[in-house]
Design a protein with these regions (language model features):
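Segments forming oxygen-rich coordination pockets for charged ligands
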Residues: 1-58, 62-74, 88-91, 126, ...
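Acidic-glycine-rich active-site phosphate/pyrophosphate-binding loop
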Residues: 8, 136-147
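ADP-ribose/adenylate-binding Rossmann-like module
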Residues: 56, 92-98, 108-134
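Short amphipathic alpha-helix with an adjacent loop that forms part of the alpha/beta core around
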Residues: 79-89
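Beta-loop-alpha module in the N-terminal Rossmann-like domain of NAD(P)-dependent dehydrogenases
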Residues: 100-104
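Active-site capping/gating segments
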Residues: 123-124, 142-169, 173
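A short acidic, amphipathic alpha-helical/loop segment
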Residues: 45, 105-110
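Short hydrophobic/aromatic-enriched beta-strand-loop microsegments
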Residues: 73, 114-121, 142-146
Length: 207
């Protein structure tokens, strides 16, 4: 027997021994913290790649000038935004605000989350200082800080906002492909169904 129900952020494939829950619909989300020029170039390209794009910026001057069709603009604080978004394994978060307070607020919630990609704009020096803050002031572990991709973007020598956006999306796409490939086991395996469940006929799987 099959039934449809509304999914919630954070829902995943799940098997409880009797019922298999699968997800259908939009699978990839991108949260951009900071509504500046680079975000304006990232957003339309990310949507073309199949991402739902959410932009967060509590600064009035940036929020007021955001006009990229198809995106969702939030003016809540970054930490609250990430928490409400409930990032899952199909969520990417990139901080672009150029404001340590806003960027750090987002990272404090993003790094411990299930997001498959967490990136931060800035120079190597800026990101080194950011990692130091996370370790020394916020008590993050080395493993959590190692999840941060910063400077975000593949090293293609980008300088202008469009070039930086391309480099960021290239790294994001690369990681999504790698993530998808590594998760290419059958969804039943991802949600904890053991091999012997299949062997004894507990569930019939159609390829």
């Amino acid at each position: 027997m099959a039934a449809l129900a509304s999914a919630q952020p954070g829902d995943q494939f799940h098997w409880d021994g009797k019922t298999l829950t699968t997800l259908h619909g939009p699978q990839w989300r991108l949260l951009l913290v900071g509504a500046g020029d680079i975000a304006r170039y990232i957003a339309p390209m990310a949507m073309a790649l199949g991402f739902e794009v959410i932009v967060c910026d509590p600064r009035e001057e940036y929020a007021a000038s955001w006009n990229v069709p198809g995106t969702r603009l939030l003016t809540t604080m970054p930490d609250d935004t990430v928490t409400a978004l409930a990032p899952d394994i199909r969520t990417a978060i990139i901080v672009l605000a150029h404001d340590p307070k806003l960027d750090d607020m987002a990272l404090l919630e993003a790094l411990p989350s299930q997001a498959f990609f967490v990136g931060a704009l800035g120079s190597r020096r800026t990101n080194a200082q950011r990692r130091k803050r996370l370790l020394e002031h916020f008590g993050f572990t080395e493993a959590l800080v190692a999840r941060l991709r910063g400077p975000v973007g593949l090293p293609i020598g980008s300088r202008t906002p469009p070039e930086i956006a391309v480099s960021i999306l290239a790294e994001l796409t690369q990681e999504r492909i790698r993530h998808t490939t590594q998760s290419s086991t059958h969804p039943l395996q991802e949600c904890g169904l053991l091999a012997d469940d299949l062997e004894r006929g507990a569930v019939r799987v159609a390829d």
